[in-house]
């Protein structure tokens, strides 16, 4: 597992006067079908702090609070536990003007692709919370690896379980105080109402593009991140009734429907 320090790219931009597109080439080459303009539009949407004269000090301030070697050691330890893939991780400072991420996600955001991970966080994020973000995303990469899933094949239920399991692992490895803020959203009664009225009927949908509004919420009157929180509650409900806790690797390989126990039992898988 390699962590790419984007601060070095920005230094080359300022010192060698290289274009941002050239210095960011190690990432841009991962998806050559995307133009540099498309790439940077996507990165800025996800929270990237822009690279310009006005943000130069912010880039330096962010980098002072990042220990790349320590983060790499941590993720390599997780790779050993998860028997996960050799993934490349690209880390970036978060734009403090990105209110949705600062407020809704506590100043950190991550996206996992099959062979690489993007991670963004605010300059003041403590190291243990940086680890929590990287653990969450690397857990996704490991589950996709073990389950043989991709963007087109992954079901709504699998996506929900992935989110719940990743946060369960964060609590196990780093403590509950470092879990994502959305794990504390919404009570059980509300979640079960959404599950019974809506979600259980769509768990077999495949391809992330087909169920985006269900997973992320915020549309069609669905509260934000309802799919995420349901996934966590399904995982928590299932594992809290286990007499002997299953190890991390066993859980990574476990089929999503086997987590549907207690009030989350459904007939969808038996029709």
Describe the residue ranges of each PLM region.
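Hydrophobic (often cysteine-bearing) scaffold residues that line and stabilize catalytic clefts
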Residues: 131, 158, 162, 227
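Auxiliary, metal-adjacent structural segments of Zn-dependent hydrolase domains
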Residues: 51-113, 127
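Pan-zinc metallopeptidase signature
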Residues: 201-271
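Inter-helical turn/loop segments and adjacent helix faces that build the functional surface
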Residues: 145-156, 175-182, 241-247
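Short pre-active-site segment immediately N-terminal to the catalytic Zn-binding motif
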Residues: 118-133
């Amino acid at each position: 597992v390699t962590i790419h320090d984007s601060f070095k790219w920005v230094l080359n931009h300022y010192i060698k006067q290289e274009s941002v597109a050239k210095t960011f080439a190690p990432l841009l080459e991962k998806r050559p079908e995307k133009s540099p303009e498309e790439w940077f539009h996507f990165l800025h949407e996800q929270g990237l702090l822009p690279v310009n004269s006005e943000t130069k000090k912010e880039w330096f301030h962010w980098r002072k609070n990042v220990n790349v070697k320590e983060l790499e050691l941590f993720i390599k330890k997780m790779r050993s536990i998860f028997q996960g893939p050799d993934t490349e991780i690209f880390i970036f400072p978060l734009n403090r003007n990105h209110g949705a991420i600062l407020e809704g996600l506590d100043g950190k955001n991550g996206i996992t692709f099959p062979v690489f991970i993007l991670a963004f966080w605010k300059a003041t994020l403590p190291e243990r919370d940086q680890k929590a973000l990287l653990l969450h995303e690397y857990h996704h990469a490991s589950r996709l690896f073990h389950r043989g899933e991709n963007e087109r094949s992954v079901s709504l239920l699998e996506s929900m379980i992935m989110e719940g399991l990743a946060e369960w692992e964060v609590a196990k490895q780093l403590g509950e105080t470092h879990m994502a803020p959305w794990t504390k959203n919404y009570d059980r009664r509300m979640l079960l109402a959404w599950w019974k009225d809506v979600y259980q009927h769509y768990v077999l949908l495949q391809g992330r593009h087909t169920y985006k509004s269900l997973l992320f919420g915020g549309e069609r009157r669905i509260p934000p991140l309802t799919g995420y929180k349901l996934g966590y509650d399904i995982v928590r409900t299932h594992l809290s009734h286990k007499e002997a806790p299953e190890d991390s690797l066993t859980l990574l390989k476990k089929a999503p429907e086997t987590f549907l126990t207690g009030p989350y039992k459904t007939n969808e898988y038996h029709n």
